[in-house]
């Protein structure tokens, strides 16, 4: 059952990433049609922009992310129990030892970052280290180490980059279309019904694609959380530890310092005040759903 769930989550992520590339091509083609009367040119331009965004974000330094989240690097002497648990989980997962950081915050939270296992890092709050027992802390760190092993940070970064690229192209396309006047619209009105349909489709694509891209990005983030929960159980062989850890996380207060959208998606638990919004707009699946999935393993 465990391996079945892991495989299912991986398949869903592949489907969502494919949907992202389709969105990128559609928005590029729409912009190309409106601005240069060329679907191909627009689609190619969109893919190039998406690739540039993805590569530039993937190679951002770990220290930058940790600095944004006020995390301080530690050694084994600073927090031996925490350090050794990270060491043990990395050994079981067969990845290099990540750097270890602590965030001075009373909330219960943790996250991992790094574009590959070779330059990864794990951070936990002081609140988490204080409240969790050893089994629960192993489950949380197993979750974060699984993100590293599964290259989730890279996938999430690509998702953020593609969403940003879609939004950028939509913004540029929309502004240039209006600045260029009604030439494209007049041409289509003087053409035929098909041209008018394509004009409407292209304009709607420019308007709706950014929203669709954000929804796909958030869906990828939620799928990676489910996968990391299941992978943590695979590493620790202790589903009860993961369940108890999630139960404690559900009662955590928000982080005391501001957390930006990109960083929020990295944490094991939503670090900001939980708003009563649709699950579609959440970076994390409901903890109740995560616990329920673990119970059925």
From Swiss-Prot:
Residues crossing the lipid bilayer are: 14-34, 39-59, 158-178, 193-213
The protein's gene is named htpX
HAMAP family cross-referenced by the UniProt entry: Pept_M48_protease_HtpX
Q: What is this protein called?
A: Protease HtpX homolog
A GO CC term attached to the entry: plasma membrane
- Which cofactor does the UniProt annotation name? Zn(2+)
How is the cofactor bound here? Binds 1 zinc ion per subunit.
Q: Which family does it belong to?
A: Belongs to the peptidase M48B family.
User: In the record, what terms sit under GO molecular function?
Assistant: metalloendopeptidase activity; zinc ion binding
Taken from the record, one Pfam family name reads Peptidase_M48
What residues sit in the active site? 144
InterPro entries reported for this sequence = HtpX_protease, Pept_M48_protease_HtpX, Peptidase_M48
Judging by the UniProt lineage, the source's domain of life is Bacteria
Species annotation: Streptococcus equi subsp. zooepidemicus (strain MGCS10565)
| Record's bilayer topology term | Multi-pass membrane protein
Quick one: which residues bind Zn(2+)? 143, 147, 225
EC annotation from Swiss-Prot or TrEMBL: 3.4.24.-
- The keyword Cytoplasm is annotated on this UniProt entry: no
Annotated localization: Cell membrane
Q: Which GO terms describe its biological process?
A: proteolysis
């Amino acid at each position: 059952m465990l391996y079945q769930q892991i495989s299912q989550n991986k398949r869903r992520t592949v489907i969502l990433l494919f949907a992202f590339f389709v969105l990128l091509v559609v928005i590029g083609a729409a912009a190309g049609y409106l601005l240069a009367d060329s679907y191909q040119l627009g689609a190619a331009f969109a893919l190039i922009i998406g690739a540039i965004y993805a590569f530039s974000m993937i190679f951002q330094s770990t220290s930058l992310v940790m600095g944004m989240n006020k995390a301080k690097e530690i050694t084994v002497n600073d927090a031996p129990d925490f350090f050794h648990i990270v060491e043990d989980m990395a050994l079981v997962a067969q990845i290099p030892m990540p750097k270890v950081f602590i965030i001075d915050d009373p909330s219960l939270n943790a996250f991992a970052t790094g574009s590959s296992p070779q330059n990864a890092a794990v951070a936990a709050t002081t609140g988490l280290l204080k409240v969790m027992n050893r089994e629960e802390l192993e489950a949380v760190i197993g979750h974060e180490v699984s993100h590293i092993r599964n290259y989730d940070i890279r996938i999430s970064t690509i998702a953020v980059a593609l969403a940003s690229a879609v939004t950028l192209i939509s913004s540029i396309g929309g502004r240039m279309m209006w600045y260029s006047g009604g030439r494209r619209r007049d041409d289509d009105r003087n053409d035929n019904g098909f041209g008018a349909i394509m004009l409407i489709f292209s304009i709607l694509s420019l308007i709706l694609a950014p929203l669709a891209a954000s929804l796909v990005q958030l869906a990828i983030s939620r799928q990676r959380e489910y996968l990391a929960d299941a992978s943590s159980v695979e590493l620790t062989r202790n589903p009860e530890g993961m369940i108890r850890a999630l139960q404690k996380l559900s009662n955590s207060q928000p982080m005391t310092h501001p957390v930006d959208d990109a960083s929020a998606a990295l944490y094991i638990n939503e670090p900001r005040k939980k708003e009563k919004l649709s699950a579609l707009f959440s970076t994390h699946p409901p903890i109740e759903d995560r616990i329920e999935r673990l119970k059925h393993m």
